[in-house]
């Protein structure tokens, strides 16, 4: 959720923040026609041009903090996994080279990787150690993929992540030192992935549609930062957390104030969007990584990882549950927004027409930034 103060002519100039809307935001016609949210051929082009050529987030190193730890990737139906061995964290196949069975499930710790079907055994580097009853051991190992690391986030894509985020002004706020993974949510969305990003990148709806979130954060003091492949929104606290907007958020307000001994956090939230599909979020004593995985033009899988300081994750379960409930309340509300948007677009498409509305500045500037990035990355002129 957020807004920008950036003119489209400045998108390739690294970081921009706190710029005057009147001076820097030009009228734009970068809105996307309704057909782009439902076209199967275009969807396949997006997967190739944007996702396979993008940063390719696969997980955080905190998913596997100890040697022998493994964590299967839910976004890939456990087809690959992160494994920590003596050399560090590896991304490798979780499919046995014998009869192509999924070997490990979920997360845990192993000395070796053993397929339950025929006991083929691999070491933590993916090399085959033994194949029972074979006179000559096959030379078949698990495929491994090189990784990039930024603040513990692991990427397999071709983009230079460190270069993309080199001038990120909130990098220290998104530092995971002292944190641990608590849980992962998989949320299925019945709408296009671009619609999700659009809702995430605009604050116009926060007050009218989010009674809970809109009484936790204040969009009156938004600060924006833009780069060629990312945007950041930083928002303040609403009314000193004195007026919660829903019973669920009442518990979240109370948990934040109780843990901080009444001292107000420095921000309400920080939302980083790294295109096309990665969101890293800061809340008081919480870091969240959310990634979108398009299943089809009208179906998107959102994998959400929740990280907390070790003290909170281990001993403050009321805090964890309060934050999780507040987050998911807002998530469900965002679903309704996105579903209504795609339903209206589909109605127009069936009518044989397309309509787009103006951007509200500054509250929808983030959506404009995304649309301009999309057109540039896709070389789309429709």
Region annotations inferred by a language model:
Residues 58, 103, 128, 213, ...:
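Short clusters of hydrophobic/aromatic residues that line enzyme substrate/ligand-binding pockets
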Residues 36-75:
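Non-catalytic accessory segments flanking enzyme active sites
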Residues 83, 94, 146-148, 153-155, ...:
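C-terminal catalytic domain of Rieske-type non-heme iron oxygenases
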Residues 63-159, 166:
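Rieske [2Fe-2S] iron-sulfur-binding domain
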Residues 53-59, 63, 127-131, 271-276:
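Short Pro/Gly-enriched beta-strand edge/turn motifs at strand-loop
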Residues 20-34, 177-179:
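Short, contiguous pre-domain boundary segments
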């Amino acid at each position: 959720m957020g807004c920008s103060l950036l003119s489209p002519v400045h998108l390739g100039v690294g970081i921009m923040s706190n710029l005057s809307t009147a001076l820097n935001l030009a009228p734009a016609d970068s809105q996307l026609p309704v057909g782009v949210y439902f076209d199967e051929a275009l969807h396949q082009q997006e997967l190739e041009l944007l996702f396979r050529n993008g940063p390719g987030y696969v997980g955080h190193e905190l998913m596997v903090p100890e040697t022998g730890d493994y964590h299967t990737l839910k976004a890939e139906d456990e087809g690959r996994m992160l494994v920590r061995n003596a050399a560090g964290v590896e991304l490798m196949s979780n499919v046995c080279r014998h009869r192509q069975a999924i070997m490990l499930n979920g997360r845990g710790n192993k000395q070796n990787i053993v397929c339950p079907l025929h006991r083929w055994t691999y070491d933590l580097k993916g090399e085959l150690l033994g194949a029972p009853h074979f006179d000559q051991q096959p030379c078949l190992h698990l495929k491994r993929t090189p990784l990039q690391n930024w603040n513990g986030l692991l990427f397999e894509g071709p983009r230079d992540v460190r270069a993309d985020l080199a001038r990120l002004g909130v990098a220290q706020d998104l530092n995971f030192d002292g944190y641990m993974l608590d849980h992962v949510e998989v949320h299925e969305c019945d709408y296009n992935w671009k619609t999700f990003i659009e809702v995430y990148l605009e604050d116009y709806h926060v007050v009218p549609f989010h009674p809970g979130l809109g009484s936790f954060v204040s969009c009156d003091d938004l600060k924006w930062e833009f780069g060629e492949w990312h945007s950041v929104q930083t928002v303040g606290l609403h009314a000193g957390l004195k007026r919660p907007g829903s019973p669920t958020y009442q518990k979240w307000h109370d948990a934040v104030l109780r843990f901080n001994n009444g001292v107000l956090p420095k921000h309400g939230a920080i939302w980083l969007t790294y295109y096309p599909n990665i969101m890293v979020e800061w809340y008081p004593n919480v870091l969240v990584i959310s990634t979108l995985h398009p299943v089809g033009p009208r179906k998107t899988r959102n994998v959400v990882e929740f990280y907390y300081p070790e003290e909170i994750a281990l001993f403050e379960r009321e805090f964890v549950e309060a934050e999780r409930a507040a987050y998911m309340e807002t998530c469900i509300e965002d679903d309704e927004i996105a579903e209504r948007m795609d339903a209206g677009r589909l109605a127009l498409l069936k009518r044989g027409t397309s309509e787009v509305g103006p951007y509200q500045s500054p509250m929808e500037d983030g959506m404009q930034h995304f649309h301009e990035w999309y057109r540039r990355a896709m070389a789309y002129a429709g």
